[in-house]
Amino acid sequence: MSITLHSFDTPNGRKISVALEEMGLPYRVQVVDITQGGQHDPAFVSLSPNPKIPAIVDSDGPAGRPVSVFESGAILYYLARKTGQFMPADLAGQVPVLEWLMFQVGGFGPAPGQVHHFIALSNEDDKRYGLARFTAETRRLYGVMDSHLAGRDHFADALSIADFAVLGWVWRHARHQVDLADFPQVQRWYQTLMARPAVQRGFAVPMRHA
C-alpha cells in the first residue's frame, strides 16, 4: 500500500478515509491517539508540524518519490489531483469545489469544533457565553449550506472533495447540538452520501486503538 493515513476518529480524519475509499486507493491507517498526546510524538510532528491530524505519506508520490501532506484540505486536494477524481479538470469547474472546500476548512469546522470545546468546559460562565456564540455561528453556517443545496445534489456540479470535507463535520451534528431536521436540504444531502458503500467503509475503518 503506497499511502499511510496518520489519523484518529475525528471529522478531519474521517473525511480523508472517506475520500480514499471513494477514490479506490489502497491505504493503511496509522492511529495517532490524540487523547494520549500522540500528535506530539516527534515522528508525527515531522509529518505535521502544527501538529494536528490527519497527515498522509504517499510512497508513490509525484515522479515516483515519497511525499507527505498535512492539513485535511491539502490532503483532499492532493488526492484529487493524484487520481483525477472528484475535482473537475477545467478551472471553471474547480472554482465551486475550492470555494466550498475553503468554506469548510475556514468556517464549518472551527465553529462546530468550538461548540464541542465549550460543551466540555466545567466553568458554567465560560461555557454559557462560548456555547451561545459558537452554536449560533454553527447554525448560521448550516443555514448557508441549506440554502445552497436547495435543488442541488452536491456542493459543486458533481460529487467532489468539497462534499467529503463537509461530510466529516456534519457526521458529528448531534454532538454539536444540531438537529438536521432543521436543515432539510443538508439532511437530504447527508443521508444520500451516507448511503454510499465507499462512504460507509470510510467511516467504518478503525481509527482508534482496540
Regions found by a protein language model. Give the residues of each.
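GST-like domain detector, emphasizing the conserved glutathione-binding G-site
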Residues: 1-129, 146
